[in-house]
A protein has these predicted regions:
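Negatively charged
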Residues: 1-236
Length: 236
């Protein structure tokens, strides 16, 4: 039931473990933490590991620089913790490789996405369909994720931030995050009645939707630090 730390610091491990029966496993925390070269397909004949019982994946691929396996079809319905799951703590030396489609993951039970993609330089996938209703912390979620540039709105519906209390440095250093996608984020949250109040968020982008931003900083009492309105940016 417990695979936590199983290959932690196994710096040379890169074997095929695709056929494992993981149906009863509850804890995968730190499983491949600092497993620098591991990059195996965790599938058997097209079938991925059974992760339906897993409740925690915190630090699972922390500093697993080489890993870029297909984990698209994982069942994450029971997972509550994804804290620092794909974090590259060494700031890209070497850089994190993970950039797989995980848009279909069921994240309805997840309470922490803090530092999930911290310094995950390669990651740039659409995760707008995720259910974030239970999430409490998104602090540093994309901090240093220099490739990430996706809208966090799916079929006109924004992420539900009703229970989020901490978004500090969420997009700090996410330098690819465009004004267009930042505007989408501002607009969708300003027009979502579920959006929580008194949020602090840092974004390394300019905005052009001053109306939505003003609503969030005023009516919702958000404390937003960003690169300013594009209208005030001097041409180069």
């Amino acid at each position: 039931t417990d695979m936590s730390g199983m290959f932690q610091a196994a710096i040379s491990f890169n074997q095929d473990i695709s056929s494992w029966n993981t149906a009863a496993v509850v804890n995968m925390d730190q499983m491949f933490m600092n497993a620098y070269v591991f990059n195996q397909d965790i599938n058997t004949n097209g079938n991925s590991w059974n992760t339906s019982s897993v409740t925690s994946m915190e630090y699972m691929f922390f500093n697993a620089f080489a890993f870029n396996g297909n984990i698209t079809s994982w069942n994450t319905a029971s997972v509550t913790g994804m804290y620092r799951m794909f974090e590259d703590a060494n700031q890209g030396v070497p850089s994190s490789s993970f950039n797989q489609d995980i848009s279909s993951w069921n994240t309805a039970a997840v309470t922490s996405m803090e530092r999930m993609f911290f310094n995950a330089f390669a990651f740039n996938q659409d995760i707008s369909p995720w259910n974030t209703t239970a999430v409490i912390s998104m602090a540093n979620m994309f901090n240093g994720a220099t490739s990430f540039n996706q809208p966090l709105t799916h079929n006109g519906n924004s992420w539900n931030l009703a229970n989020v209390t901490n978004m500090t440095n969420m997009f700090t250093g996410a330098t690819a995050f465009s004004t267009a996608n930042y505007d989408i984020f501002l607009y969708s949250q300003a027009n979502n009645v579920a959006t929580n109040s008194n949020i602090t968020i840092n974004v390394s982008s300019n905005y052009s939707d001053a109306t939505s931003r003003t609503y969030l900083t005023g009516t919702k009492s958000w404390n937003i630090t960003d690169l300013g309105n594009t209208a005030s940016v001097a041409p180069t």
